[in-house]
From Swiss-Prot:
EC number(s) from the headed UniProt entry: 6.3.2.9
Annotated catalysed reactions: UDP-N-acetyl-alpha-D-muramoyl-L-alanine + D-glutamate + ATP = UDP-N-acetyl-alpha-D-muramoyl-L-alanyl-D-glutamate + ADP + phosphate + H(+)
Functional pathway: Cell wall biogenesis; peptidoglycan biosynthesis
The species this protein was found in: Acinetobacter baumannii (strain ATCC 17978 / DSM 105126 / CIP 53.77 / LMG 1025 / NCDC KC755 / 5377)
Function: Cell wall formation. Catalyzes the addition of glutamate to the nucleotide precursor UDP-N-acetylmuramoyl-L-alanine (UMA).
Protein encoded by which gene: murD
Annotated binding of ATP, by residue: 112-118
First-level EC class: ligase
Protein name as catalogued: UDP-N-acetylmuramoylalanine--D-glutamate ligase
GO CC term (a single one): cytoplasm
Amino acid sequence: MLIQRGGLKVVAGLGISGVSAVNFLHEQGYQVAVTDSRPTPPGHDQIPAGVKTSFGQLDQELLLQAEEIILSPGLAPQLPEIQAAIAKGISVVGDIQLLRRATDVPIVAITGSNAKSTVTTLIGLMAKDAGKKVAVGGNLGRPALDLLKDQPELLVLELSSFQLETTSHLNAEVAVVLNMSEDHLDRHGNMLGYHQAKHRIFQGAKKVVFNRDDALSRPLVPDTTPMQSFGLNAPDLNQYGVLRDADGTLWLACGLQRLIKSSDLYIQGMHNVANALACLALGEAIGLPMESMLETLKQFKGLEHRCEYVKTVHDVRYYNDSKGTNVGATLAAIDGLGAAIEVKKGKVALILGGQGKGQDFSPLRSSIEKYAKVVVLIGEDAPVIEQAIQGATKILHAATLKEAVELCQRETQAEDVVLLSPACASFDMFKSYNDRGQQFVACVNSLV
């Protein structure tokens, strides 16, 4: 272990990663305390005896006694209690920083506004299928520090901008920002703040992967850092992209080498082609054999609530993209499915709405105009979205998700698709995006 024993470590904010940090530090023999503004925060019953707890408010006095504060990703460093500690010279880090100090196991680090979970899961499976002892987690599934219990030879981490804010010099084996679109501006203030947080992933990276189609994903790293790119265009030598045959067949390719037809993948839509290419680039960077990666890719069926195929009813296919909680994700889903069904004159019936998080919805206009026959609006920010897309296509309103699904069924015909991709958070009407997705699936299954 490379970790140093020292003074009091105060974990601010419980939840999954907070509990994980408390237990990890306690096991390492540190003096640990924890504070949370909630009177009974989730995980409060999983705190070891001997750890001081202060719940009901962020305990300013306790924070100022800390040698170091471990900030949970749900809490902003801008909070006055945290700023007071920073002003006193107290170090503020997150669980990812603790992980980096505790191990020198190579890390594949993945962030982006969208597709993080799909890419993280897929590259994890590719590594496992190639015989690596890999542990996958971070912002997805298991908290990062818990992964060390597996004694892995490789860590694959999905990282959010909130986690990266408190991480420096991650020194990843390979790092990628998959894409950048407006999200969490309520936390980061503006696009620049969000961009800066995301790009912390590249600090000390040995290799980097970037998206040629998204200039904001390209890192500023030393010229000596090996760089690999992916994009939905013809690739240069040794880069990843797509090649089209004269008959329209689309191939995933590396340089001029055709690797696999897009039609051979379970995961459909151009956004998923980009995800697959990103994984191939990441896999190459950590030395995974191409043949093994392509085999994994052929078997991969995608993730729940992420452009997940639900059912076909009267020749209309229904897709659950409840994880589409921002404009960029929804654009990828509309464009991906819209382009795929356009050949057969199919159109998209789109369910949009929820809590908009201060986003600008106008970038949806042109794709809605091109691919959507109807948009059904739900939730708190329906009026904001309506204003942004007015005139692009037919707009309807629904008070419930069930009503929205029924309206879509009424408006569609054979070869069309119904897509739930709300571009919004779910908490106005649902417990979570999972809950929203499950309710959508139940509504679709009850259609006749």
